[in-house]
Amino acid sequence: HRIATALEIHHVLTRTDTGAWTIGPALAHFSTGTSPQLITAAGPIMRQLVATTGESVQLYKLTGDTRTCIAAEEPASGLTYTVPVGSSLSLAAGSAARVFGAFSLIDASPFPPNELATVRSTGVAESVAEREVGLASASAPIFDTNGQVIAVLSVSGPAQRLAPSPAQKVGKELKAAAKE
C-alpha cells in the first residue's frame, strides 16, 4: 500500500471512484498503445474546440473493458467538468461509450440499437445525466487511415448549458474537430 501511495503521488497510479488502483496519467499513453503523435496532434484541435464551445474536451482511448482519458483541455473559466488524464471510465454509460459501441469495438448491449444506428449515421453520440447528474456530453469517433476508430473526442459540460441536445449544440464543431 505504501508503494502504491508513493506511485500515486507521482501520477503513475490513481484511484478509481470505487477505490481500486488504475494507471495514472504518467503511464496512460503507454498502456493504451497510443501514439504520442495522436496526443500531440490533438492538442491544438482540442484547445480550439474548447475556445469554440466553451466546454471541457476529452480524448478517450479504449483500454480493455474501460475507456481511458488520454488528453483533456478545460476552459479558462466557468463551471467545468474535469476528467483527469489517465482516468478510466465505464463503457456502460456516456456518449464516448456509445461511440465505441456503435462501431463494434465493445459489447454494445447496454445501448438501444436505434441509438447506435443514429451514432453511425450522424457521427455523433450524446448523453445527458447518464453517468452523473447534471452532466451532458457529445462524442465523435476519430478514424485512422484504414477507417478504424482509434479514439473518441468528447465535449462535456453542465447539462443545462448543453440543453436541449448536446449533439445539436456542439455536434457540428465536434465532428469537424474529430476529422482534422
Q: What kind of region is each of these model predictions?
A:
Residues 51, 129-135:
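Short loop/turn motifs at secondary-structure junctions and domain boundaries
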Residues 138-145:
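A short, hydrophobic, proline-anchored segment that marks a local hinge/packing element in signaling
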Residues 22-107:
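Amphipathic alpha-helical effector-binding/dimerization core
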Residues 13-14, 59-60, 142:
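A structural signal for short hydrophobic beta-strand segments in well-ordered beta-sheet cores
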Residues 17, 63, 145-146:
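Short, ordered coil/turn segments that flank beta-strands lining enzyme active or ligand-binding pockets
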Residues 1-36:
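N-terminal helix-turn-helix
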Residues 108-117, 121-125, 133, 151-180:
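Juxtadomain coupling helices with adjacent low-complexity linkers
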